[in-house]
Amino acid sequence: EDRYLNGEASPSLVERLFLRRIINNMHENHIEHFKHRLIYNYRAEDKICQLYNQPFYDGELKTSQAIEGKREHNLSIFNSSVVWINTNRRSDKRDKQVGTGKINRCNALLINSILYKLKDDMQKYNLKHSIGIITPYRAQTNLLKDILSKIKKEFKDFYQKNSDSNQDKDLRNGFDIGTVDSFQGSDRDIIIYDCVRSGGRIDFIADEKRLNVSLSRAKKLLIIVGDMEFLYSATVSEGENPFNKIVYYIDRNKDKCQIIDANANTKGEKKG
């Protein structure tokens, strides 16, 4: 402090010293017990919460009663709030290298088809769910923006006709597409997570924290698109494969989660 008063120390150094003193005092005064983990889920429908609760939080998360009955998606096309569209039996399921990234056209076309079905169902039941599409790769983001351009315009028109979308930034543009970074701190009623990968090592997407954030953006409906069998057993250079836990949970909880064979949805698939 004397060095700062004499102009010999920068404010940043003083701030660091001050912070260090606070931390040291915390330890010295034994107030670690005041630190606690946030254990209540105020965002997601309980089935969605349980998907990442078991693998990533050791089952400690609890869904608040404050959102009970307020997170149903009320759509007829899905019978759960957790849905995996499994591409394992698709002949065109493999991802491709583009520059330093990856793309998966099969997944993109399936998402396009899913969005058309969502729009039809939302129109039928007068629902206005906000939608976000998350994918690990920027290259896939660009492909999705291209393939989904038509349906995005249709969603935008639908929202404008059926709600005051100018007052809701999540509806204004139809839906959002991006990597998890663009969804940090936000959520959507419906999240579609595009796994992209269907071959090779999955090091880039095997980040547990980023996967956790991606899945936990959904409030009412979480749709995962990807090759379940591959992702369950995929190899990583270091650490564990987090998809193993997710796939295991979904497969063991079919009463709570819905698995749809993407191969059965080939007929009538929209090409964008």
Show where each model-derived region lies.
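Conserved helicase motor core of SF1/SF2 NTP-dependent helicases
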Residues: 1-272
